[in-house]
């Protein structure tokens, strides 16, 4: 896949929406003439709110055969309606949606202590859960799995002391990434506004995952609509005290 990173913003190539469409068409045709399989990435936007940047290419049918995926970066977050637009765009072109840079605050490295705070971890996993539920991306590429924007702390990372150790963000990512392979998104709703949910399932293998993010006080949760043949569920809890702490829940009559 080929793209100029965040060309809606100009880092470091600046396109207008129409120029972006023309580039996809002309460079895509050039690659095709060279018999290269490389496809073009539509968007790769600096955040989700600049959705209109991809509209000229969406409306120009001659660009579609060169587009391999649609992408936006999740910086700064956005509302549910905007996320839904990206999901619908991917469905319209029948290509995957990729979150090309995943996290919430591109400037956070300037005040890096925030990476070790639970509030930052909660905001980030909330956004990822909403993205998974609403626009169903093929992949969220975490920015980034290095010492920069690190999911780890200690050993001098941003001058932090002590041994290298995982932060709450690490366990959030690990828990989300534990979704079964080749699982498809399943519709899920929550009766409480302060709980975000996303569900996945691989029906052929009988593997399912339900991710819940609680933004309120401790509470009991009842999940309904599970397959009738499931008798137990493995539960993982991550918060300021628990790091994917595992337990087993009994399932009866699909709940």
Question: Which residues does each PLM region occupy?
Answer:
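Acidic, Ser/Thr/Pro-rich beta/coil linker or hinge segments at domain junctions
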Residues: 227-255
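Structural recognition of the beta-strand scaffold that forms the well-ordered cores
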Residues: 1-3, 39-42, 68-72, 96-101, ...
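Carbohydrate-binding surface patches
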Residues: 189-231
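Active-site cleft segment of glycoside hydrolase catalytic domains centered on the general acid/base Glu
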Residues: 1-57, 79-90
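Short, acidic/polar
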Residues: 48-62, 120-131
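Aromatic/acidic polysaccharide-binding cleft in carbohydrate-active enzymes
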Residues: 96-175, 180, 185-195
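Glycoside hydrolase catalytic-domain groove-lining segments
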Residues: 29, 33, 37-41, 62-110
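Solvent-exposed loop/turn segments at secondary-structure junctions
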Residues: 4-10, 45-49, 74-78, 102-107, ...
């Amino acid at each position: 896949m080929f793209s100029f990173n965040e060309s809606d913003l100009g880092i470091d190539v600046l396109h207008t929406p129409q120029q972006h469409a023309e580039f996809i068409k002309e460079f895509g045709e050039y690659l095709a003439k060279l018999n290269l399989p490389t496809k073009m990435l539509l968007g790769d936007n600096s955040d989700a709110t600049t959705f209109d940047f991809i509209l000229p290419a969406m409306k120009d049918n001659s660009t579609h055969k060169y587009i391999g995926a649609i992408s936006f970066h999740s910086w700064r977050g956005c509302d549910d309606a905007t996320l839904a637009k990206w999901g619908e765009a991917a469905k319209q072109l029948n290509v995957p949606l990729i979150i090309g840079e995943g996290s919430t605050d591109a400037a956070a490295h300037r005040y890096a202590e925030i990476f070790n705070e639970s509030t930052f971890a909660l905001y980030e996993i909330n956004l990822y859960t909403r993205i998974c539920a609403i626009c169903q991306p093929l992949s969220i590429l975490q920015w980034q799995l290095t010492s920069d924007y690190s999911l780890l702390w200690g050993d001098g990372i941003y001058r932090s002391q002590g041994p290298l150790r995982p932060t709450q963000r690490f366990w959030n990512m690990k828990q989300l990434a534990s979704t079964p392979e080749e699982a498809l998104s399943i519709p899920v709703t929550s009766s409480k506004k302060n709980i975000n949910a996303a569900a996945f399932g691989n029906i052929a293998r009988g593997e399912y995952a339900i991710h819940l993010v609680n933004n309120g006080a401790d509470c009991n949760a009842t999940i309904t609509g599970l397959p009738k043949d499931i008798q137990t569920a493995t539960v993982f809890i991550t918060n300021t005290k628990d790091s994917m702490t595992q337990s087993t829940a009994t399932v009866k009559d699909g709940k």
